[in-house]
């Protein structure tokens, strides 16, 4: 963004064109004309930043910066201002994943803008690194006020900052903020030694002619399990040179104890074998082996089909199939029993119905009075009925 005046006269810049504007410190040193020019720079850049971020209100303004501890970092060259970055401390209430609220006071990035004509040329990273160096902090120790998608992508690309928990105050605090606190405390608690001289210089100070007896005494005092009384030597028979190994203070077993352990181990083996033989799985495997010996499947499969009278022997697993078939048969029998019971209940209900009782009584009366019709036993296929005072009259017809 170009202006009609030189920005170097308003803010002290270094060789790379980087500088910082601190309102409290620089207000007394700046004239009224320079204040107007600074206000013009901050107002125009703040408006462009709000338009680029799609904000309804302008965040950065010359009047808003005055009377605060905020700092505005600027990158400029001559009459052009490439971008700015505004920071300041804020008291924030942070809610974690468990719902716990913490009060923190981090340094916050309040506004960050690089002109469209200067983007993707390294000005943003240069300005951000300059701010970190001046504030003596790191990117994960910062809080970001309403960061735009471009700023989030910038932090992910250059500083690997991705994970954060959304807050009601629209500030973004990355998870590394709290991890860095824990790591810094751990570093302070650790008792580390730093030697300015190389290791070779220290090794030259160690005495070479150290008495051997004193070394043994010191080892026995500091490490009691290395004393001579508690050390047992045993020769390794498989080693070529008959090397001697330390038993680490353990007493060597006698022959009787070794025999006892061997007997116990043999008893345990016998018990396990008996358990295996008595188990149901072992019996099934034995049955399969006996089946292979008795029926000789290879010979049987070769002769199968030559003599149809030979019955196919039972194969392994046939018992399971028979069990399944029996279960299905039992299930169908149960279903038939249920159906029969339902039929019996329906018959009982019909017998108790008054309509069916009247119908049966009328039929009994007709048969007793007139007798059965001889035509019913003939080859007539259908008939018609007509009622009268004497009962039902049947008229039979042929096809």
From Swiss-Prot:
Record-stated family: Belongs to the acetyltransferase ATAT1 family.
Annotated acetyl-CoA binding sites: 112-125, 148-157
Organism expressing this protein natively: Tetrahymena thermophila (strain SB210)
Keyword Mitochondrion among UniProt keywords: no
Purpose: Specifically acetylates 'Lys-40' in alpha-tubulin on the lumenal side of microtubules. Promotes microtubule destabilization and accelerates microtubule dynamics; this activity may be independent of acetylation activity. Acetylates alpha-tubulin with a slow enzymatic rate, due to a catalytic site that is not optimized for acetyl transfer. Enters the microtubule through each end and diffuses quickly throughout the lumen of microtubules.
Site (Crucial for catalytic activity) residue list: 53
Polar residues bias spans: 183-193
EC number of the protein: 2.3.1.108
Boundaries of every N-acetyltransferase domain copy: 1-178
Pfam families: Acetyltransf_16
InterPro entries given in the database record: Acyl_CoA_acyltransferase (IPR016181), Atat (IPR038746), GNAT_ATAT (IPR007965)
Catalytic activity: L-lysyl-[alpha-tubulin] + acetyl-CoA = N(6)-acetyl-L-lysyl-[alpha-tubulin] + CoA + H(+)
Coiled-coil blocks: none
Biased composition (Low complexity): 194-223
Keywords (A to Z) from UniProt: Acyltransferase, Transferase
Biological process annotations from GO: regulation of microtubule cytoskeleton organization
A GO cellular-component term linked to this record: microtubule
GO molecular function: tubulin N-acetyltransferase activity
Region entry Disordered, spans: 183-223
The protein, known as: Alpha-tubulin N-acetyltransferase
